[in-house]
Amino acid sequence: PYVQFVHDSMRNNMPWNEFAHQLLSAKGSGWSEGNGAVGYFVRDKGMPLDNLSNTMRIFTGERMECAQCHDAPFNKWERIQFYELAAFTNGQQEINRGPWNTVWREVRDAKEERSEFGRLVEWLGDNVHYFTLGGGGKGRIKLPSDYQYRDGDPGEMIGGKTHFGKRIRSSDRRDDESARSDFANWMVASNDNFTSVIVNRMWQRIMG
C-alpha cells in the first residue's frame, strides 16, 4: 500500500506539499483505502530517531545525523536541537495488537517460534497486521542516558521546538496528541527550506 500510495500520488500529480504532509501526518491502518502514507513511519519501525534524521534531510536539506549522538562538528546543529525536533514525532505505536498477540502466544506456547510456521506468523505480524500507526506524537521526549551537555540532563523530559521557519513549541509536562500534525504543518507551510530543497533537486535533475 505504501508503494502504491507513492505511485498514485506521482501519477495524479499530487502537489509536493500535500504529498509530504500526508507522509508526516497519516495514521490508522495502512490497508484502509488511500491511507498507504502510514508506511513512511512504519517502514522505520523501531528507529524513530533515524526517521527524524531522514525526514529533515529529505524535506529541508538539513543534515542532522551527527546531532543524534553529539553536537555536529561541521554544521550548526546541536544534540539538544535534534531531540527537540524528535519530540514532535515521538510516541507512535501500532494499533489493534490484541488479535495477533493471541496468535503469537499460541505459537510461543507450542514452542514453534523458530519453525517455518512460526516465522510465517511473525512475518505476517510485522508486514501485514502491524501495517498501522497510532498516536499523534507526544510532543515531548526524554534525553538519552548518555546525554553529555550542560543544556540538559540525562533522562530529562523536554518539549518539542523548531529552530527555523515559524517557531512552534510543545510542553514537556503533558502529551500533545496534535504534535505530529503540528510538525507536518510546520514542515510544509512555515519554512523556506522545504521549498528550496525541492526546487534545487528539480533544477539539478533538469540541468544535470
Regions found by a protein language model. Give the residues of each.
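Glycine- and hydrophobic-rich flexible loops that cap the catalytic core of alpha/beta enzyme folds
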Residues: 176
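Conserved pre-motif C helix in the palm subdomain of viral-like polymerases
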Residues: 188-193
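Flexible, polar/acidic helix-loop-strand segments at domain edges
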Residues: 171-173
